[in-house]
């Protein structure tokens, strides 16, 4: 069974390297995963150290608003992606990448804001935009690979995005915080990488139509 799983992974990796859309999705997906999960990992420490929030404050000002924004963003992103896809082969790619390009400035505002009246709305807006990608990105992967290997390629994407993305974010932000003496400054890396990742995903707009046609030919 282990040998079969390894063979499946190797086949999935070879398919990724032969499919331009998947290359952009894998690279961009790792970057946006870095941004999202870095924000989650350091959010509590940020609010306690920068704003002096208590545990109760964090629950009401971060958890609830982030959850609400994330749920609404995932639903909106999926619906918008499907609506666009009916009119344009790049619809799902656009929805997956656009949320991070639009969300980058909002996340910067969240990190830099001192007026706490804006904090909860910015948390919700950031997570709303940062969760558009969840459904569309997986759907793009399924759109450009044969049905026989869809699960293997999707599994390879999840593995790659975690190893190259969110596994790196917490220690790197911690290191930069120690080096700069400012957690706020260190966390500005997250929206920067998120915008870059969104832009990399959007490069797949140039290739997704051709890759979809090849699968369905």
Language-model features, listed with the residues they occupy:
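C-terminal transmembrane helical hairpin of 12-TM major facilitator-type secondary transporters
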Residues: 89-137
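Interfacial helix-cap and linker-helix signal at transmembrane-aqueous boundaries
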Residues: 47-48, 80-81, 85, 172-181
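Multi-pass alpha-helical transporter architecture, strongest
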Residues: 104-113, 188-217
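Membrane-interface helix-entry/capping residues at the boundaries of transmembrane alpha-helices
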Residues: 59, 96, 154-155
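A late C-terminal transmembrane helix in Major Facilitator Superfamily
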Residues: 74, 142-180
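Flexible cytoplasmic inter-helical loops of multi-pass small-molecule transporters
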Residues: 1-11, 212-217
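A membrane-interface helix-boundary motif in multi-pass transporters
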Residues: 54, 91-94, 175-194
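Extracytoplasmic gate region of multi-pass secondary transporters
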Residues: 18-77, 130-138, 142, 165-170
């Amino acid at each position: 069974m282990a040998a079969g799983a390894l063979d499946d992974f190797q086949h999935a990796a070879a398919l990724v390297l032969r499919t331009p859309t998947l290359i952009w999705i894998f690279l961009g997906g790792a970057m946006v995963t870095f941004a999202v999960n870095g924000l989650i990992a350091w959010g509590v420490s940020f609010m306690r150290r920068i704003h002096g929030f208590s545990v109760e404050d964090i629950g009401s000002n971060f958890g609830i608003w982030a959850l609400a924004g994330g749920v609404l963003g995932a639903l909106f992103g999926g619906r918008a992606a499907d609506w666009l896809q009916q009119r344009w082969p790049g619809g799902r790619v656009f929805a997956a990448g656009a949320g991070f390009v639009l969300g980058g400035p909002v996340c910067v505002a969240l990190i830099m804001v001192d007026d706490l009246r804006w904090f909860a709305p910015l948390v919700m807006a950031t997570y709303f935009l940062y969760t558009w990608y969840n459904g569309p990105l997986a759907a793009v992967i399924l759109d450009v690979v044969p049905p026989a290997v869809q699960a293997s390629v999707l599994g390879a994407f999840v593995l790659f995005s975690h190893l190259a993305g969110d596994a790196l974010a917490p220690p790197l932000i911690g290191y930069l915080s120690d080096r700069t003496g400012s957690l706020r400054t260190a966390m500005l890396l997250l929206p920067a990488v998120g915008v870059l990742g969104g832009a990399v995903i959007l490069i797949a707009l140039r290739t997704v139509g051709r890759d979809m046609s090849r699968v369905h030919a």
